[in-house]
Amino acid sequence: MLESICKAHPKLMVSDYEIKEESQPRTYQTLCYLKEKGYACKLLFGSDKLPELKTGWKHVEEIAKEFGIVCMARYDDDCEKMILNDSYLSSLSQYIEIVHTPKEYHHIYSSEARKQFLIAKDAIQILQDTLPKELHGLSSYLFSEDNHEK
């Protein structure tokens, strides 16, 4: 699914690097891997994550200096002010690019998408555990775009 989305957007790509690793690599490791493969990368996140950089992330300075950070401003977040009022973020400000996204995209969060995906995945597993094996293909039918009203 993601690969088909990327076909329409040449600047995007899908990598299975993190999935294939034995343990979950840190963001910095993933960015280094992609750089080794010849890709130019930056860390992209929403403004809700900006305050977490100091305490919730590892290798932040390395990521900022080696790759750069792109922060998507959401809702009425004043990212410039958030950075200015925080000494840690201010020290990284030259590496942070603020992107003001259109309002129709403010509600889109990758963490929420992952959460909903896991809920759906669990529901499919419950469905498969409940139904006879002959009906296990039902989940692909239920989630096919051809079977949804538009």
What residues fall within each predicted segment?
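Nucleotidyltransferase catalytic core that binds NTPs
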Residues: 1-150
